[in-house]
Structure formats: structure tokens, C-alpha cells
Amino acid sequence: MKVALGGTFEPLHEGHKKLIDVAIKLGGRDITIGVTSDRMARARIRSVLPFAIRAENVKRYVMRKYGFEPEIVKITNPYGKTLDVDFEYLVVSPETYEMALKINQKREELGKRKITIVKVDWMMAEDGKPISSTRIKRGEIDRYGGII
């Protein structure tokens, strides 16, 4: 089963790892992980590491935990490869769920079948709020959700 997920993945935290773990449970080695291009990542308010470093961090996580090198692609537009490739599943967070609905709407307009959306709940930090890259960058929590 072909599975996709995407994101900026910076810094790579427990919430990201949960998304990757769910994708691998669904698709095994047949996963495509989209990592946003530097241009797309720079559209965010906070600074992020270059694409090559972010992609390498994701690859390293999968290789260490699962023993294989995942397919990693650069996302240069909001849809990534989801309009071109017939994925079975699209793994998303609550933050990216609306975009997943737009992807399926666009796929329908193109005469393609919808992708099954798998929404993975937030990973909560010690304070009961979601772990997020923004909160980590602000120094509120660490990558594991611990209060700093």
C-alpha cells in the first residue's frame, strides 16, 4: 500500500515521529515522505534548517528505527506528489487535515480517486498542549514535549 505524508520536519520531534510511525505501519517500506523545499519553508515566520539537513534527519530516523531508507521527495507546492501518484493513504496531523481535504477535492476535479486520509492525533507535551515545532523553537518545550 502506497502511503504519503509531508511536512517541514524542523525540528524533528515526537509528533513527527508518530506520523512517520503510523505511515510505516500502514505501508511498510512503500512510503513517500515529502519534505518542504527551502522556498516553501521560508514562507513560515520562524527560521528553519535547509532542506538537505531536514530530509537527512527524517531519513536517519527511519533508518535507525526501521532499517530501511525511505523515499524522500522535495515538496515545492502545497500538493506535493499527491495529484500525480495514486497513494492509498495520506497520513496527516490535525494541522494539515484541511489541506488533505483540498488534495482530495483537487483529485476529484482531475477525475482521480480520493486518497484515504488518516488523521493522527496530536502528541501532547507535559503541559497538555500539543508538541509543535513552533513551541520548541520558542523554547517552551523540548522535542519530547518536556517543559523547559
Swiss-Prot record:
It is an enzyme of class 2 (transferase). Transmembrane segments: none annotated. Keywords: ATP-binding, Coenzyme A biosynthesis, Cytoplasm, Nucleotide-binding, Nucleotidyltransferase, Transferase. It is found in: Cytoplasm. Its EC number is 2.7.7.3. Its main location: cytoplasm. GO terms for cellular component: cytoplasm. Reversibly transfers an adenylyl group from ATP to 4'-phosphopantetheine, yielding dephospho-CoA (dPCoA) and pyrophosphate. This is Phosphopantetheine adenylyltransferase. The lineage of its organism: Archaea, Methanobacteriati, Methanobacteriota, Archaeoglobi, Archaeoglobales. The gene is coaD.
